[in-house]
């Protein structure tokens, strides 16, 4: 029947993504604060390459660009989309999920991996009360949480703990794992947090725009450059370990910079934009790298809510029912966020209410499933949303 054929088509398309490491890999996620590639908005020139190492990583990774649902702020919404596979598309504008909608143990990559025997660790080198994470992380099912007091607070760039210090902590936790411990680490960095207007004695800014004078943009790009060096340190370490390791890296949202900078990129600024131009501001780079699989897969457009499904597939882990639904949905709806979705039939971005035909069917079913997962306490589908064991 048609559904079975649809599943076969989806399975064949994602054969490139799936890999079999032979044993359960360590899975490390880095959601990098304000990490973005501003060239998606428009062209500009700098004195040096902003992220040379990131650009070199593509050869043995799934890589590309993903839609975020937020611009310049509200990090936890990206965190939530990644972990749960849910989308801000179906929640009221301006929502912050962690402060409004988290229930006890929602189905997520945390509960799925925990049910699969993983130890689940959350790391965030900032205050535990930020966005109520100290309450939310235990609800999500994390076994361990590490906040600012667990990090070396002398390792600062400007006034935030460095990516390098976060990565050293990740490596320490990996090296101290028990003999048969399967490890999942979800980390959220702080180094590149806005704003970018103050000058700091502890930060030698290496990147500068050519032909344009925007000190905040220079500082931001210099921070991304520092992130790039730290990333090389992290990947170089895990390239040389024998056990299988997967690293998922993505930005949570683009930075908030001088509004007068944007006309230099897109010719218009931040207003009067087409839907496609607006979505450029919600686009962040990502990769999923492993030390056991060398195939390169380029995904020119996806969205943060799909990344955990891609990560589970690449890790060789059998997809839970909800993630299988998302893997199938990607074939028709390659990207979706709070603004709209990428329509293959239209060849561009549309608002959700503009969807027709098969695209509308997928979006409607996704909305129904997400509502069931988040709000339907009595009739929650245990097929799609098994409880934490």
Model-based region annotation:
Residues 12-24, 29-32, 37-389:
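Solvent-exposed soluble domains appended to multi-pass membrane proteins
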Residues 1-15:
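N-terminal hydrophobic targeting segments that direct proteins to the cell envelope
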């Amino acid at each position: 029947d048609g559904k079975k054929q649809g599943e076969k088509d989806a399975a064949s398309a994602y054969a490139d993504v799936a890999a079999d490491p032979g044993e359960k890999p360590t899975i490390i996620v880095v959601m990098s604060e304000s990490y973005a590639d501003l060239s998606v908005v428009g062209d500009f020139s700098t004195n040096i390459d902003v992220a040379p190492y990131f650009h070199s990583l593509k050869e043995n990774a799934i890589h590309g660009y993903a839609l975020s649902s937020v611009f310049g702020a509200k990090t936890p919404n990206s965190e939530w989309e990644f972990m749960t596979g849910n989308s801000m598309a179906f929640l009221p504008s301006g929502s912050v999920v962690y402060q409004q909608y988290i229930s006890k143990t929602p189905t997520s990559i945390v509960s799925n991996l925990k049910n699969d025997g993983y130890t689940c660790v959350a790391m965030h080198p900032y205050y535990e009360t930020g966005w109520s994470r100290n309450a939310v992380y235990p609800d999500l099912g994390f076994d361990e949480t590490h906040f600012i007091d667990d990090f070396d607070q002398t390792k600062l760039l400007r006034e935030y703990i460095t990516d390098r210090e976060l990565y050293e902590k990740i490596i320490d936790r990996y090296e101290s794992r028990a003999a048969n411990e399967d490890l999942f680490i979800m980390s959220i960095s702080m180094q590149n947090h806005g704003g970018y207007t103050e000058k700091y004695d502890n930060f030698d800014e290496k990147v500068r725009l050519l032909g344009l004078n925007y000190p905040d943009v220079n500082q931001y790009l210099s921070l991304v450059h520092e992130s790039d060096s730290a990333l090389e340190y992290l990947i170089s370490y895990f390239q040389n370990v024998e056990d299988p390791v997967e690293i998922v890296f993505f930005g949570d949202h683009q930075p908030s910079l001088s509004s007068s900078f944007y006309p230099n990129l897109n010719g218009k600024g931040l207003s009067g934009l087409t839907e496609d131009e607006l979505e450029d501001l919600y686009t962040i780079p990502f990769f999923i790298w492993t030390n056991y699989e060398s195939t390169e897969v380029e995904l020119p457009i996806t969205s943060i809510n799909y990344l955990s499904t891609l990560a589970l597939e690449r890790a060789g882990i059998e997809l839970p029912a909800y993630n299988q639904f998302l893997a199938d949905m990607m074939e028709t709806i390659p990207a979706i966020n709070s603004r709209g979705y990428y329509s293959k039939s239209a060849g561009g971005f549309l608002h959700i209410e503009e969807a027709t035909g098969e695209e509308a069917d997928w979006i409607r079913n996704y909305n129904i499933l997400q509502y069931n997962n988040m709000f339907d306490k009595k009739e929650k589908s245990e097929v799609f949303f098994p409880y934490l064991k």
